[in-house]
Amino acid sequence: MAPTKDFSTATNGADSWDDVADFVTKKGHGVKGLSERGIKTLPKPFHQPLEERFSEKKILERASIPLIDMSEWDSPEVVKSICDAAENWGFFQIVNHGVPLETLERVKEATHRFFGLPAEEKNKYSKENSPINNVRFGSSFVPHVEKALEWKDFLSMFYVSXEETNTYWPPICXDQMLEYMRSSEVLIKRLMEVLVVKGLKVKQIDEIREPMLVGSRRVNLNYYPKCPNRELTLGVGRHSDISTFTILLQDQIEVLHVRKLDDTGNTWVHVTPIAGSLIINIGDALQIMSNGRYKSIEHMVVANGTQDRISVPLFVNPKPQAILCPFPEVLANGEKPLYKPVFCSDYSRHFYTKPHDGKKTVDFALINY
């Protein structure tokens, strides 16, 4: 067997795509493995195009996403705050959300445990080795179509059943992720009650509409190791989520940025983590179902030069067989539909066949009048 390339000697950033792909992807070391080798210069395949790189000059000073206390979640004041945030920001941070703080801590600990496994253990869940498509370990986003790789490792797990979870999810983190998903169910129902029933005046979320809104779950464990030349790359490029909405758990490392809505320039809002909080962001599916009233917003993760970071997004998605289209109640006053009906599975497939590219995915469903 040929020896593994010593990336610690890389000084000119010119390492070939094949060398990096072999080490990061095929051997399962991930970008964590690169970082741990003490590289001083970022390998060339991670260099983002100039127009995609992030600059501190793009940050809008003294601005922040809304912070909402969910303890009185069904009060008129809180309902209005949530709906206003979904319309005007697409992102908001919540406290007193009902998910036990000890559950969140166990999730973060389990995430660190998984990424602390040897490369050969993590690589058992790679695209080539995983016994099931619903569990996937990898790096970047879709490396085979990206012109520049993102500085991130991930484990993605799509929930189907408890039986499949017990059989195929990594034992080192599976119980904690299941606990997190179960503990979030009440919060999910409350958000749907506020955003859909109260906000969009949909009469009820019945057995037909519930799968259309929240029929599936995917949880990702993300790891962003410290990065040399962090200004040259990104942890995650600018994109909007395709979910109904996403519940994001993150640590205290400040790297998440959200595009300012209705801004004609290229300015972003820095998201400051609050201990014990969760971040909610509206996804493309709910933007479509609300006929554009609620907004899925571009966001990105910048690389950090001194600290490792984790995040755990829980994607609350429509069922794959669901049809995405505006609710009839939203169009009842004669409002023209902005989006054509599309299968959720087709929309998702479109998203995963291209690199992150801002808000372009939603154009897949847009009606061109």
UniProtKB/Swiss-Prot annotation:
Annotated catalysed reactions: (E)-4-coumaroyl-CoA + 2-oxoglutarate + O2 = (E)-2,4-dihydroxycinnamoyl-CoA + succinate + CO2; (E)-feruloyl-CoA + 2-oxoglutarate + O2 = (E)-6-hydroxyferuloyl-CoA + succinate + CO2
Protein name in the entry: Bi-functional coumaroyl CoA and feruloyl CoA ortho-hydroxylase Diox2
Keyword Metal-binding among record annotations: yes
Binding site for Fe cation: 239, 241, 299
InterPro entries: DIOX_N, IPNS-like_FE2OG_OXY, IPNS-like_sf, Oxoglu/Fe-dep_dioxygenase_dom
Cofactor(s) of this protein: L-ascorbate; Fe(2+)
SUPFAM superfamilies on file: Clavaminate synthase-like
Family per similarity comment: Belongs to the iron/ascorbate-dependent oxidoreductase family.
Physiological role: 2-oxoglutarate (OG)- and Fe(II)-dependent dioxygenase (2OGD) involved in scopoletin and umbelliferone biosynthesis. Converts feruloyl CoA into 6'-hydroxyferuloyl CoA, and p-coumaroyl CoA into 2,4-dihydroxycinnamoyl-CoA.
Organism, as annotated: Ruta graveolens
Gene Ontology molecular functions: 2-oxoglutarate-dependent dioxygenase activity; 4-coumaroyl 2'-hydroxylase activity; metal ion binding
Key word Iron present: yes
Note on cofactor: Binds 1 Fe(2+) ion per subunit.
List of residues binding 2-oxoglutarate: 224, 309, 311
